[in-house]
């Protein structure tokens, strides 16, 4: 069984990012290592939840131009994570391909549906009522999720079914995504490409 591990370095005039992802943490067999430091506390919290509940190990460090705002850091971290995810998946053989999940957090309930398709698309409904959650702009939540989807080459739909607390709305969305990813990338035991086209890695 081949390892699904990948690293990405992303450097621009706005950010410097290193990201390593291991898609196959096995409880009781391998140690799940998660270390996220983006300079944005709430973003760290969301990416940590994504890795934890997605069954992944994740090392993600970023130094960005936060003296301007959170846009470049949040967007570029999501792009790097998506690139590493796509690289780790490789030829996308022997996986379920589709994943879906619901995740509650108190009064909030979110749904995520993903297709590991090489057809980047993103739809989202997260009705935030505040400008920020912690030090992350709420408008960046959907934007960074879109950035991840396009960099990873996946179709992604995320919806808040209900929720009042903005922290809970965001966190339940990330946890639903984590569980959907975990389903979609799970191995089937075969080596087939789950597509009538015969190829998914484009």
From Swiss-Prot:
- The answer to whether UniProt assigns keyword Phosphoprotein to this entry is no
Name the reaction it catalyses: D-erythro-1-(imidazol-4-yl)glycerol 3-phosphate = 3-(imidazol-4-yl)-2-oxopropyl phosphate + H2O
Any single biological process term in GO: L-histidine biosynthetic process
The source's superkingdom equals Eukaryota
The record's keywords, sorted A to Z, are: Amino-acid biosynthesis, Histidine biosynthesis, Lyase
Task: Supply the EC number(s).
Answer: 4.2.1.19
What InterPro entries does UniProt report for this protein, alphabetically?
Answer: IGPD_sf (IPR038494), ImidazoleglycerolP_deHydtase (IPR000807), ImidazoleglycerP_deHydtase_CS (IPR020565), Ribosomal_Su5_D2-typ_SF (IPR020568)
> Which SUPFAM superfamilies does this UniProt record tie to the protein?
Ribosomal protein S5 domain 2-like
PROSITE patterns named in the record: IGP_DEHYDRATASE_1 (PS00954), IGP_DEHYDRATASE_2 (PS00955)
Q: Per the record's keyword annotation, is Chloroplast included, yes or no?
A: no
Kindly name one Pfam family recorded for this protein.
Answer: IGPD
Q: Name one GO molecular function term.
A: imidazoleglycerol-phosphate dehydratase activity
Q: In which pathway does it act?
A: Amino-acid biosynthesis; L-histidine biosynthesis; L-histidine from 5-phospho-alpha-D-ribose 1-diphosphate: step 6/9
Q: How does it assemble?
A: Homotrimer.
Q: What does this protein do?
A: Imidazole glycerol-phosphate dehydratase required for histidine biosynthesis.
**HAMAP family reported in the protein's UniProt record:** HisB
* Family membership noted in the UniProt record: Belongs to the imidazoleglycerol-phosphate dehydratase family.
Please identify the protein, giving its name as recorded: Imidazoleglycerol-phosphate dehydratase
Its lineage opens with: Eukaryota, Fungi, Dikarya, Basidiomycota, Agaricomycotina
């Amino acid at each position: 069984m081949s390892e699904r591990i990948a690293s990405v370095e992303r450097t621009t005039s706005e950010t410097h990012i290193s990201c390593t992802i291991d898609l196959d943490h096995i409880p009781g067999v391998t140690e799940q290592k998660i270390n996220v430091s983006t300079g944005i506390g709430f973003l760290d919290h969301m990416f940590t939840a994504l890795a934890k509940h997605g069954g992944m190990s994740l090392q993600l460090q970023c130094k960005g131009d936060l003296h301007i705002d959170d846009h470049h850091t949040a967007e570029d971290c999501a792009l790097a994570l998506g690139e590493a995810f796509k690289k780790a998946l490789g030829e996308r053989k022997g996986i379920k391909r589709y994943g879906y999940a619901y995740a509650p957090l108190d009064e909030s309930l979110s749904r995520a549906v993903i297709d590991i398709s090489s057809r980047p698309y993103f739809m989202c409904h997260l009705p935030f009522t505040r400008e920020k959650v912690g030090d992350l702009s709420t408008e960046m939540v959907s934007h960074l999720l879109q950035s991840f989807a396009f960099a990873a080459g996946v179709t992604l739909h995320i919806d808040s079914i209900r929720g009042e607390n903005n922290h809970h709305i965001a966190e339940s969305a990330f946890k639903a995504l984590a569980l959907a990813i975990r389903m979609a990338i799970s191995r089937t035991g075969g080596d087939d490409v789950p597509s009538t086209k015969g190829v998914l890695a484009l």
